[in-house]
Amino acid sequence: MSSSPTVSWRETVQSYLDRRLLWVFMLGCSSGFPWVLIGSNMSGWLKDAGLTRAAIGYFGSVFAVYAINFLWAPLVDRVKLPLLHRSLGQRRSWIFLCQSFVLICTLLIAGVNPANNLMLTSALALGIAIASATQDIAIDAFRIDTFPKSDSSKLPQASAMAVIGWWTGYSLPGYLAFINADSIGWNGVYYGMAAIVALLMIFTLLVGEPTTRREQLQQEAEQRHNQLVGSKVVAWLTVTVVEPFLDFFKRNGVRVALTLLLFVFLFKIGEAFLGRMSITFYKEVGFSNEQIGYYSKLLGWGITIFFTLVGSMINVKFGIVRGLMIGGIAMAASNLMFAWMAEVGPNENLFLATLIVDNFTSAFSTVAFVSFLTMVTGQAFSATQYALLASLGNFGRTTLASFSGELVDYLDNWSVFFVITALMVIPSLIMLYSLRHYFHDLLEKARKESSEE
C-alpha cells in the first residue's frame, strides 16, 4: 500500500530544510485566518449575544462558498490581474487582492453588533468567505506549483507546512480573541484581527513566486482548441472553463475520477459535523471563554503542529495511501473522546486529553489527504483541479455541517451526536480499503507523468 520509496529518518528530517516550505507555511497562515473571523470567533460572539444553537449552525452556511469555489477557479488559473500581476505574479496577485477584501470586511464587522444587525453581519461574513475561498484557490495552486509532482518526495512536507500554517493562522489569533473577548469585547477583538490581516498581506509580498510550465501548457491547449473551433475567443473560454475538467477525467479515466470524487466527499464528513458544534459544546459543558482560548486554541495549536510534523514524517517514510487508512480510522475513534467528555462534564484534564487525541488524528489524516489531492492534479490547471477536489472535501464541513445544530437539538444528547459523527467516516474507509491497490497504482502513474510535464 505504500506510495513512496522508503527513506531513512535522517533523510526525512533533513528534507524539511527547504526555504520553499517557509513560503508554504506563511501562506498557510493566510488561508487559516479567515476561518477565525467567520468561524470560532463568530460562533463565540453569537453565543454571547444570545443566539440559539440552530441559528449559530445556520449562520455557518456562509462557508458553503468553499464548496463551490471550483466554479471560479479557472479564472484564478487564467486571468491576469491589472498592475498586480506584473509586480507579484499570477498566484501572489490573486492572494493579495483577496487579502485586501478580507481586511475591508473585517474592519466593517468590527463596527457592528450581530445581535442587532445579523443580516449585515452575515453579508460581511459572506464577503470574507468568498474572498477567503478565492484566496485558497491561489494558495493551493502556489503550493502545487512550488512543489510539482517531479518533486513528489516533498509532497508530505509541503502538505504538513500548509496544515501547520493553516492551524497557526487559525489557532493563535483564535486564542488571542477568546482570552481578550471578556475584557475588550468582541468589537475590539475584530479591530485587532484587522491588524493581523495587514501583517499577512506583508507576508504575501515577501514570498517568492514559483516558476512553472503552466503558461506554456495552457498555450498549447489553447492552440489545440483554436484549431477545432476556429476562434481565439472561444478557444480561450473553452481552455479556461472546460479543459481543466476534461483534463482531470482524461488523466484518470471516468470510473477512477468519479471514485476519487466520491472518496474525497465522504472522507471528512464526521469531522465536519464535530467541528461546527465544538465551541458551542465547550460552552454548554461549562468551559469559560478563557479556558476555551487556552486549551482549544493555544494548546491545540501546539499539539497540532507537533503531530502534523510527526504525521508528515510517517507519510514520507511509509506512504500516503497507508497514512490515509490509519488516519481515517484514528479520526473516527477520536470522536468518541468527545462523547466521553459530554458525560463527564467540564473536566480540564479530560479536555486536554481529548484535544491531544483529536489533534493527532486530525493532523495525521489531513497531511495524507492533502498530499493525495496534490498528487492527482495536473500542472497546467493546478488551481482549478485542486479546487474541485478541495471543494468536495469541504462540502460536508461547509454545507451539510450547517445542520449540525439541528441534529444536536433533535437528539438532545451530545454523547449520541459524537458517536454518530464517529460512524460517518466508515463508508470512505471501506472504499479506500477496497481500492487501496488501485489508488497506489494511480499515485505511481501520477509520479511517472511528472517527467512528461
Predicted regions and their residues:
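Intracellular loop-helix junctions on the cytosolic face of multi-pass helical membrane proteins
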Residues: 1-18, 104, 110-123, 134, ...
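Helix-loop boundary and gating motifs at the non-cytosolic
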Residues: 6-66, 258-263, 267-281, 285, ...
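Transmembrane alpha-helices of Major Facilitator/SLC transporters
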Residues: 65-72, 294-316, 327, 334, ...
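Helix-to-loop junctions at the C-terminal end of transmembrane segments
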Residues: 69-87, 181, 306-323, 408-409
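C-terminal ends and interior cores of transmembrane alpha-helices
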Residues: 93-115, 329-346
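Intracellular juxtamembrane helix-capping segments at the cytosolic ends
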Residues: 134-148, 363-378, 388
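C-terminal transmembrane helical hairpin of 12-TM major facilitator-type secondary transporters
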Residues: 322-369
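A late C-terminal transmembrane helix in Major Facilitator Superfamily
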Residues: 376-409
